[in-house]
């Protein structure tokens, strides 16, 4: 028995010695080759990572190729991304070793919660899948079904992030995510979209719009981000947009309006920035716009009005209750309705050119110009005296009473013909 024990001890000692020698040889070889100039590296992800999980070197196999032809596995290297993103099915990270870099695609492990078939005309062609990390991901290819008034199959599900894969080509996403107060983000929208009415309406925690400038077929964005009270940043409006009524209404944290100058068919921006109380500049309005009613109603931090397009027709309440507004924009002859356009603009002063003879100009300056500074009315309108009297402010005057009287008489003759 004692002999057997001694034999085992000897065997284990020999094995330990062999292992030690092999490790020593391996360490010596590694130390030697690791000093050689690196030609390139290859990396493979061999681990598993969940959303937001920190990455470690043990998750990667990194193979090093030297200029002398040696090949070995790197034991220490730098990983560009320290942890996996919270959303998505994969991400890219860079591996760096001795000045050489390579990019590795890392899959993210998520658990499926529920899945819906929403393709059109074949339902199975597009899948809407909700995962345990809050992703609502659209995969497959082709168009999707239309859903009346936001009656989507995921309406009552819990999700916080929306992802569209490149092959998805929906044309209508009206009210798809309306009222989801937990939604925090959405990646690039499909280029195929034509109508996005109320798509993100009431998504109170959305801070940034998805990229949609590339949506060259998008025509309708009415109420699209209305009530997104955390929204701070927006993509420019695509060239194709025609209707944008209430698109950013009550986005109280939006300080800069999206660029609209690339559009060439935009006709209505009724209430587009209504209630955007943090907006500090009125954006340039495209020449194609005809309806600007309530466009900036209640925007209390705008100081200068943006020029009206020369063909605009409706500017009723366009800048009503903009209490900080100091400089008004000239009212073109094309205007049919300018009722309450500058009503409640208490800080207005300087000059206001009015060139329309429309009868719908009641309350144009009601409760305005009350700060003690003078606003002088001028222009080709025959109704300057009416507008002055209707304002009820002693600080509203006529710049050239003689011209104003001539224009008034001219208008009277035209009306009597």
Write out the residue ranges for each language-model feature:
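N-terminal Sec-pathway targeting helices
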Residues: 1-14
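Sec-dependent signal peptide cleavage junction
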Residues: 21-34
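Solvent-exposed, low-complexity, repeat-rich "mucin-like" stalks and linkers
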Residues: 34-71
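Serine/threonine-rich, repeat-prone extracellular segments and beta-strand-based repeat modules
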Residues: 47-48, 69-104, 108-110
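Structural signature of tandem-repeat unit edges
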Residues: 81, 135-142, 157-171, 181-195, ...
């Amino acid at each position: 028995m004692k002999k057997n024990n001694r034999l085992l001890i000897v065997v284990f000692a020999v094995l330990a010695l062999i292992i030690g020698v092999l490790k020593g040889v391996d360490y010596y070889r590694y130390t030697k080759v690791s000093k050689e100039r690196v030609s390139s590296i290859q990396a493979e992800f061999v681990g598993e990572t969940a959303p937001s999980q920190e990455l470690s070197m043990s998750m990667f196999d990194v193979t090093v190729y030297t200029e002398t032809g040696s090949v070995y596995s790197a034991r220490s290297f730098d990983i560009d991304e320290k942890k996996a993103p919270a959303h998505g099915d994969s991400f890219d990270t860079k591996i760096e070793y001795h000045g050489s870099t390579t990019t590795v695609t890392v899959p993210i492990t998520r658990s499926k919660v529920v899945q819906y078939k929403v393709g059109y005309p074949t339902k199975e062609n597009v899948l809407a899948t909700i995962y345990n990390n809050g992703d609502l991901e659209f995969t497959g290819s082709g168009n999707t079904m239309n859903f009346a008034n936001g009656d989507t199959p995921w309406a009552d599900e819990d999700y916080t992030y929306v992802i569209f894969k490149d092959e998805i080509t929906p044309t209508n996403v009206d009210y798809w995510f309306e009222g989801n107060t937990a939604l925090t983000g959405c990646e690039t929208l499909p280029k195929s979209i034509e109508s996005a009415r109320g798509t993100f309406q009431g998504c109170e925690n959305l801070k940034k719009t998805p990229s949609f400038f590339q949506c060259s077929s998008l025509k309708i964005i009415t109420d699209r981000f209305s009530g997104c009270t955390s929204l701070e940043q927006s993509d420019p409006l695509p060239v194709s947009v025609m209707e944008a009524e209430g698109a950013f209404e009550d986005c109280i944290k939006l300080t800069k309006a999206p660029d609209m100058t690339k559009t060439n068919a935009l006709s209505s921006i009724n209430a587009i920035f209504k209630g955007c109380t943090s907006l500090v500049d009125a954006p340039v309005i495209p020449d194609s716009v005809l309806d600007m009613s309530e466009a900036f109603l209640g925007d209390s931090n705008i100081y200068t009005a943006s020029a009206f397009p020369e063909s605009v027709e409706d500017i009723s309440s366009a800048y009503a209750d903009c209490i900080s507004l100091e400089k008004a924009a000239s009212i073109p002859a094309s205007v049919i309705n300018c009722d309450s356009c500058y009503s409640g603009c208490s800080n207005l002063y300087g000059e206001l050119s009015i060139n329309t003879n429309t009868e719908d100009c009641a309350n144009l300056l009601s409760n305005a110009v009350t700060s003690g500074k003078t606003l002088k009315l001028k222009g080709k309108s025959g109704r300057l005296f009416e507008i002055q009297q209707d304002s009820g402010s002693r600080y509203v005057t006529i710049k050239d009473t003689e011209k104003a009287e001539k224009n008034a008489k001219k208008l009277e003759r035209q009306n009597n013909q």
